[in-house]
Amino acid sequence: MKNIVKIVAVTIITVLMLLACSGCYSSPPKIQSGEFPFVIEYEYEGKTYIIEDTVVCSYGGVNPDAGIPTRWYACKLKNNSDVRILTFEKNTESFLVEGMINEASYITLDYGYGGYYLGDRLYKDSGPCFSYVEMQVSPTGVKSTKYTSLTKKEIEKLFDIKIIRFEFSPPIENTFE
């Protein structure tokens, strides 16, 4: 009887694993790459800045190590390594951790995840946004990086940066086979 229970348990687990590996999360997208231009225009201290670039995305395959196989995407900017809206002076007080002094801090564009642009419904909420980043060193010498997403209203209210345009190409409609 114990052997039958073991065989049934192993069979059920094997079937579930095979179903997961062949499921919708591992299906490749029909359109596997794309370019998505964007424009950001903002005003800071009376001066207007315009940033134009293109987010380049491609399907990278399936990651089977996550328990349920998931699609992996690569994403980068065509002309820049990153987009910093504003960099603050060193040794400024932390906005995120009371009493901490920043080694560096800046507002950057988080241009989103490749799956968002390539129409993967699992990443429909992973589009572009602004992030505030702080790099800190504690009194004991431990380095850490903290960040938080910011809305356009928060950027205007907290940092006196007026966002004039924030235009991104929309994600494509895609199918997964």
Task: Describe every region a protein language model picked out.
Residues 1-6:
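Positively charged n-region of N-terminal signal peptides that target proteins for export
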Residues 24-26, 37, 81:
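Short structured motifs
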Residues 128-177:
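Glycine-rich, aromatic-bearing surface loops/beta-hairpins
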Residues 35, 47-146:
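Structured domain cores in non-transmembrane regions
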Residues 28-45:
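Alpha-helical transmembrane signal-anchor/signal-peptide segments
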Residues 9-18:
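Hydrophobic helical h-region of N-terminal Sec-dependent signal peptides
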Residues 9, 25-27, 71:
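Sparse, context-dependent recognition of short Cys/His-centered cofactor- or disulfide-binding micro-motifs
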Residues 19-23:
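C-terminal motif of bacterial Sec signal peptides marking the signal peptidase cleavage site
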